[in-house]
Amino acid sequence: LLLLLALKTLWAVGNRFEAQIIGGREAVPHSRPYMVSLQNTKSHMCGGVLVHQKWVLTAAHCLSEPLQQLKLVFGLHSLHDPQDPGLTFYIKQAIKHPGYNLKYENDLALLKLDGRVKPSKNVKPLALPRKPRDKPAEGSRCSTAGWGITHQRGQLAKSLQELDLRLLDTRMCNNSRFWNGVLTDSMLCLKAGAKGQAPCKGDSGGPLVCGKGKVDGILSFSSKNCTDIFKPTVATAVAPYSSWIRKVIGRWSPQPLT
């Protein structure tokens, strides 16, 4: 009975598909100054989060095109507002987690900018978890944001959308009725507050924030049907990788994290 009740509350974005926000709300402009739009020569592809003046954290699977064709745009609210074009940087170096694979395990990548971001009201880094054990607990209230599609098979959002989420028990999400054992301990399983709400195509790589002041997860994958209740959206927990992230940043940018 408990499982059936849980089924009614689940949502998702059965095959894995890059996480993409349906049923969200427009964010207050520039209320999430850490948000990044990863774009190719044509349009927005994925989200990301500024974690250092020279580094962005995103999902490794988002790097499906040559780096020369990609750019990072900061300080955006609307994707196509000529009056507010944002701040653009190109990628000098991309470092995927060495354990990343096509099962979306360890789905993280660090992108080094070709310059340094000057913190401002609209562009500001989000802190990393301090310890590897600082994963948010089951039941935690979280939120995410992105410019992903707002309807199944629809178009990208015109402005930044946000969505409230709650963390589910990963063991339940690994049940044969759900993800059937594919989730690892470093993955976070998520549900929205209402049926028909979910991150969707274009939201991969965006940050999951639980509480205040730090990035707790990076949106990773879901099903092709964004709101499939049997396939909750999955994020990569950042805390277990905090040492790796700091090591990479420290190696290539020998200065204190900001």
Swiss-Prot record:
What is the protein's name according to its record? Granzyme M
Please give one Gene Ontology molecular function term for this protein.
endopeptidase activity
Q: Which residues form the active site?
A: H61, D107, S204
- Species this chain originates from: Rattus norvegicus
Residues the record marks as carrying a glycan: N174, N225
A GO biological process of this protein is: proteolysis
PROSITE patterns in the record:
TRYPSIN_DOM (PS50240), TRYPSIN_HIS (PS00134), TRYPSIN_SER (PS00135)
Write out the transmembrane intervals.
none
